[in-house]
């Protein structure tokens, strides 16, 4: 993993999450991105010719390797940790970290552990039963300035996973920030 991604990931894991009603959004445009209930992957794909996934990590981890914040949204069990960078036309846009409990991996129509470079959102939002709850947002201070992030719990066929996403400096969420 390269140095900027390592730093971004560490900052994302330690984010100070807030409920949307308590958060100061920089614009209505950013608010719509952060509160998106559907697939972020699909939304990103509409802003580029080629949406790609760089898989940085895809391995099971014990409960002891998760933060207290992360375990609050899930049952305490071994999770698959999937960390990726989503890029639009070769420009990094979003760093994602997903925690998928072993019980969520079981009995699904898709093998979430072997997605590789397929965007998770495209797979999850293809399932019959998908819901998002516990949506939170954050500003994350980086050497490049403040960046926006969101975290939510996705339910796929009534089984949870925790998804955190950091919008990198060139992400489309910032394209209308000054408008």
Curated annotation (Swiss-Prot):
EC number: 4.1.3.40
Catalytic activity: chorismate = 4-hydroxybenzoate + pyruvate
Cellular localization per UniProt: Cytoplasm
GO cellular component, one term: cytosol
First-listed, main subcellular location of the protein, grouped into a coarse class: cytoplasm
Disulfide bond annotation, renumbered to this chain: none
UniProt keyword list: Cytoplasm, Lyase, Pyruvate, Ubiquinone biosynthesis
Amino-acid positions noted as binding substrate in the UniProt annotation, renumbered to this chain: 82, 120, 165
Pfam families registered for this protein in UniProt: Chor_lyase (PF04345)
UniProt pathway annotation: Cofactor biosynthesis; ubiquinone biosynthesis
SUPFAM superfamilies xrefs: Chorismate lyase-like (SSF64288)
Keyword Iron-sulfur: no
Biological process according to GO: pyruvate biosynthetic process; ubiquinone biosynthetic process
An annotated Gene Ontology molecular function: chorismate lyase activity
Role of this protein: Removes the pyruvyl group from chorismate, with concomitant aromatization of the ring, to provide 4-hydroxybenzoate (4HB) for the ubiquinone pathway.
Family note: Belongs to the UbiC family.
Name assigned to this protein: Probable chorismate pyruvate-lyase
Organism name: Vibrio vulnificus (strain YJ016)
Gene name in the database record: ubiC
């Amino acid at each position: 993993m390269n140095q900027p991604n390592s730093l971004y990931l560490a900052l994302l894991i330690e984010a100070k999450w807030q409920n949307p009603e308590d958060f100061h959004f920089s614009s209505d445009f950013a608010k719509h991105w952060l509160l998106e209930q559907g697939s972020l992957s699909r939304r990103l794909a509409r802003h580029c010719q080629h949406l790609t996934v760089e898989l940085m990590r895809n391995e099971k981890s014990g409960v002891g390797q998760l933060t207290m914040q992360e375990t609050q949204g899930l049952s305490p069990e071994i999770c698959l940790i999937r960390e990726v960078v989503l890029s639009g036309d070769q420009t990094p846009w979003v760093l994602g970290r997903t925690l998928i409990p072993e019980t969520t991996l079981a009995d699904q129509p898709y093998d979430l552990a072997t997605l590789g470079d397929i965007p998770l959102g495209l797979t999850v939002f293809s399932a019959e039963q998908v819901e998002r709850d516990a949506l939170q947002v954050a500003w994350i201070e980086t050497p490049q300035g403040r960046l926006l992030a969101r975290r939510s719990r996705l339910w796929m066929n009534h089984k949870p996973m925790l998804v955190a996403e950091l919008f990198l400096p060139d992400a489309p969420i910032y394209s209308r920030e000054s408008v």
